[in-house]
Structure formats: structure tokens, C-alpha cells
Amino acid sequence: MIVRVPGTSANLGPGYDCMGMAFKLYNDFHFEETDFMSEEDKESLMYKTVEFFYKENNLEAPKLKITVDANVPMTRGLGSSATCIDAALLFANEFSNLNLEKQKLLEYATRIEGHPDNVLPAFLGGLVCASYDDGLVYYKAEVSEKFKFTLLVADFAMETKLARKAVKDTLSLDHVISNIAKSNLIFQAMRIGDMDMLRRSAKDYIHEPYRKVLIEDYDMLKEIANKNESVLFISGAGSSLLVISDSNNKNIDTAFDNLGTKAKWKAINLEVDNDGAYILR
């Protein structure tokens, strides 16, 4: 069985741990039954997820050979772990013939990942906002075609644990209120294609001020985006950066060429995936 899952960009600035979107950048996972599994195979996130599914449903997990055709860069803030989890759950649900409802699979994915901002958009496609503290509640929307997206992928990795450790444990009430308001506005701006609303709602107080120091060239790249009337966010935990522009903005197409940066950055133009994960065959 082959399962295809899109990469994602989470947070979108103020939407920390609750908002994300999917792109047409895919990992394809190949699942085959086998008689022998190495210890390395047993410890993979994909197989651990399959085991989780079978244990939750009082079944014994099959032995599997799992290979990946990977196009989503690892440890770059693009939801590579979410692709592993979603692929394994889709496989297990189909292979076991249990055919559990989508809501249950999404709850499993969030329990395994610990937060919904990558696993939900990877599974569902589009733009997703979700809450998990009192049961999983989410809303999916399609992103306006008035935007275009440039992903800046660095030549250095960012460990999620390190990025999470950088975030402060306490925040001022004013900053919390600002983030709540702006995350709502960003979701709406992405739906209706309002670039002005997006730009005016992009400031985050929870994670970007603390994570940006871990990303070389951040301030320079942010300034380039601002000068070209675009918005730049740290994608997930980093190190990748997501630039959102008006679809008619021609200047942004070459704005990140020939950069005199410390790190090497690759600019990739991406389209939104509105369909999410699915079984190829």
C-alpha cells in the first residue's frame, strides 16, 4: 500500500500550536507485510504509530517493511513527523479493515504528535485551526487564491526540542490578548485573501521573538519580505521560513535571489494542497 501525505507549515505567526496549512510537497510511504523486522524498523515513528493504532483497538500489529520517497525536508519545520504519523494511521485503518471515522484518526494523530497544527492540515489539507485541551475541535478552510507562497529552506536543521525550549513559560496578559486577536484575523485574512489584514496581524509574541535568534539571517530575510510588501513567518519550529505575498506581486519572485547570507537558502514556490493525505494504491 502507498500513502501520500503533504508537508505543512504550522503556526503562521500568532497561531502557535493551533494553526497550520498544507502544501503540494509530498512524502510517499510504501507499506509491505514482511516476516522479519529489524530493531531499527521497529523503532521508526511510522511503525510505532501502526502499533499505537492496533493496541488502541486490541489487535496485534503486523510485521511491516516501510520505505519512504521523501520530498519533505526533515527537521526544517515542514511537518515531516506529521507525514509519518498520518501515513501510518491511514495505512493501519485500511489494512485492519476497521474503517474508523476520520475524527478518531485525527484524535490519534494529535495524541501521538502532542499538538494538532501539523497533523491536521497534513491529513485534511487546506488551512486548519484546532484546539485539543478539551477534546479535539477543528475547522478547515480553503486558502484564497489571491496569495502566493515562497518557502525558504535553509541548509541547517532545527531540532524541535531546542526550538520549544526557547519559548518562554510565562507571557504578559497584553501579549496573550494580542496573539488571540491576531490569530483570528490571520485565519480570516487567509480565507478571504486580504493581504493588508494579513500584514497588520502578523506580529507574534509567543514564539517568534525567541526562536528567531536560532535562525541565521532571520532579520535580513524578514526585512526583504517587508520591503516587498510580503509577510514572513517561521515555519513550524524552523529553520524554514514561509513568505506569503499577493498573487500579483512580481518583485517577490526574485527578491531572495543571490543573497549575501551566512546560511544557504533555497527559495521554493509552493501551491496549497486542499485535499490532504490519501491512499495512492
Set out the residue ranges of the language-model regions.
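Active-site rim beta-loop-alpha module in soluble metabolic enzymes
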Residues: 151-212
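DPxDG-like acidic metal-binding loop motif
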Residues: 78-101, 123-128
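Alpha/beta catalytic cores of group-transfer enzymes, especially the acyltransferase/condensing modules
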Residues: 102-146, 232
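Short, conserved charged micro-motifs
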Residues: 36-40, 160, 248-254
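Glycine-rich, charge-dense phosphate/pyrophosphate-binding loop(s)
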Residues: 190-281
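A short glycine/serine-rich beta->alpha loop
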Residues: 9, 35-40, 70-79, 107-116, ...
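ATP-binding N-lobe of GHMP and related small-molecule kinases
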Residues: 1-76, 90, 94, 98-100, ...
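Short beta-strand-to-loop capping motifs
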Residues: 33, 154, 243-247
